[in-house]
Amino acid sequence: NWLQNTPKYVVSLLKAWWGENAKSENDFDFAHLPKLGRGFQGQGYAFLALTHAMLAGEIKGLFCFGQNPVVGGANARLIRAAMDKLDWLVVADLFEHETAGFWKRPGIDPARIPTEVFVLPACSGVEKEGSIVNSGRWVQWRNQAVKPIADSRPDLDIVDGLAKAMKRTYEKDGVFPDPIRQLAWDYGDHADPHRVARELNGSFVVDVTEKDGKEFAAGKQVPAFAQLRDDGSTMSGNWIYCGG
């Protein structure tokens, strides 16, 4: 019953996200996690339920990174109608595609669509370094072949910039600022994919001696997910990749 190890993975994840702020006395900041409940009309927030939630006005904004749901989704007409109800839409991709331009489709008056659309220029896979995973179950590390053109940036840089801006904003004010303000977000001035990969794998937070006498110094990477712990002495952004 491998599920008995869930506390080890959850605590290690919380330590990765909130670092020194995640302590045993505050349940490792478990309360910082958003609670989705049963989702939209009890259907969760899978793709179709997410679309209906936008259509109903429950979801006000949407980020689309490297995807084109207006073309790739199951019901293009429904998806476009749902996006008509958004306050804002952020698309990060190589070019303006059908999702980014949903508001100027034939037969529609753009002036009647209130959605504010932001198109962020992401660079291509050969213009950045980092790992990829996909539905074909690939896990690859790719090196940068050429520099990004014009103002395009790796999507990691885009997310990093957004996160840092949010942290600065929540330092000043907010109804419930701690989950953002206390984030352990330090991947360098320009986000380093190696730091992200190291966090995903995980490391020991303090010096640890295991039952068999093996010693691991604080900062050393955890060699396998079976060695993650639920006492706050390890951190791992994704236990599946631990030791990979």
Language-model segment annotations:
Residues 1-201:
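Non-catalytic alpha/beta scaffold blocks inside enzyme catalytic domains
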